[in-house]
Amino acid sequence: MAKEVGKDRLGDFYTNGKVRKRREWRGFADTMYDYWRWLHIMGILAGFIMKPRNIKAMLRYRWMANYLAVPMMLDRHTQGLRGEYLRICHTEQDLVVSDVAKLLNNLFRGDRRIGNDTEFSKKVVLVDENEMTAVMMGFPTLKGLSRETPSTYVSVLLNQNAAVHYIDVAQEYGLAGDVCPMPEAEAGVSIDDDAPVLGACAIQCNTTCDGSLMSNGVISKRLELEDGIPVFQLAAPLRHREADVQEYAAQEIRNAIAFIEEHTGEKWDWDYYFECAKRVNISTRYRMDWLDMNKTDYPQVFGSNLALYTETNYMAICGKIPEFVEADRKIDALAQKAYRAKKKMAKEYRHRAIIWGVQSHFYFDFLLWLVNCWGIVPLTDMLSMVSTKTLCEDNTPEGREQAIYDIAWLTENMIMRNRTHGGYKVLLDELWEYVEEFHADMVILWEHMSCKALNGMHGQFEEKAREKGIHLVWVTHDLFDPRVISRQGVRDQINRYMRAVMQEEPLDPSLEILHDEHSW
């Protein structure tokens, strides 16, 4: 048990079961802080489950059982962290946990099977999990809620096996088994009648791939034909960097806004939109500052601390919740303090890596494992390299027209889609630009075996890596399905490369092989 960074054998905390042996001792101050935040999380969970309708939902929906693992997920993402890094993680993750609890509460409030609050349901617009919620930035009286976010996306972060049942259900009904398991699981939830039913209407987007379009087709038909909920298909252009598609993209946003107004009776509020736009710009400036910091010898906000928070704040929040700007300020203050003191997250930094490709969702804390086990610093990842465009903040006729194009740009540049669509420049060329900017000596390239967009460029990635003399490590996975390649299977691909090619020994040998196949 150690206060100093890197003194503990973190692998010794693991068991063959679902939870670890004990909590980590981080020194008195950090241990008390971590325990206080653990109590805070337990308070959120207790407040959630005290409502009778949420107890009913726990018994009705299979995927709700995964939320018992919320504290364990936080523990996985704080392994080995001390000082400012521990506080950055809790500032981000605890806010995300609170936001997901509110999302669940709202879903069950309007759900016809659970709360059946019909008046509230009339103010709900259902949105895709993989969709930018920018189209809701001008509706202060409406709730843009995603059913897929808690049922599949967050569930797999909590429990690596959460989506397995729904993947199997989708395939039992004839859906192809070689498509991305994320939309397949989402379709399985709908087929299994395991999604809350509520809302005045729904907005679906053509993200992020053909598998998503397949899933949207299954889900939208059930919404329209069985539940009587009209669905708008927002078709964002694929060539999103081209100027000649932006007018079409803007018209799609106008059509989506008109659709929402028609089915909810609410009108777009420009004052509220520009409030949200200002908050988006604030968050963007902070994110750019953190990325600039990561280009130095003392990166501060990286790995899971960057990836999970960016996904939530950028795509799901879109400036609609002021608490996220407050969190940005706290995170930045902590990062600046650690940077001035030249602090490091681990006892040794050996390699600077760019993480590219579609992240293994059932093993998101892999980014922290890289630092703790091998001293590989994940400076940034593909899903965090999203739009840094400043949105127009002028509430004038000209500013309002520009705002429509800004919303369209955000929709085109949602996380993952902004790289898997748009041509080889955004996926291939910009990777090597980032390698130079961040002074990286290594690229860890996720090879999501069901993602055709990235797999088709395998050879081009290798050719460029050889040309530039960069270590390129392929890590194969199947996103939501740990049965195909397990967490240890993911780790082994790094272990083999580091030992055979780099001729290195791990910083913490206890982390090299973990028996976590049954772990949440």
Language-model region placement:
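Hydrophobic alpha/beta core scaffold segments
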Residues: M136-M137, L370-T380, N395-D406, L410, ...
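Redox- and metal-dependent alpha/beta enzyme cores, enriched for Fe-S-associated oxidoreductases
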Residues: E119-S121, E129-D168, I354-G423, L427-L431, ...
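Internal, well-ordered alpha/beta segment that forms a basic, Gly-enriched binding/recognition surface
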Residues: D193-M293
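Generic N-terminal leader/targeting and pre-domain segments
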Residues: L68-G199
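Gly/Ser/Thr-rich loops at beta-strand to alpha-helix junctions
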Residues: V125-A134, N206-M214, W356-Y363, M449-G456
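Extended, charge-rich low-complexity interaction segments
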Residues: D178-D194, A258-R279, D406-L428, V501-W520
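A charged, amphipathic alpha-helical module
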Residues: G11-V124, A250, R254, A258-K389
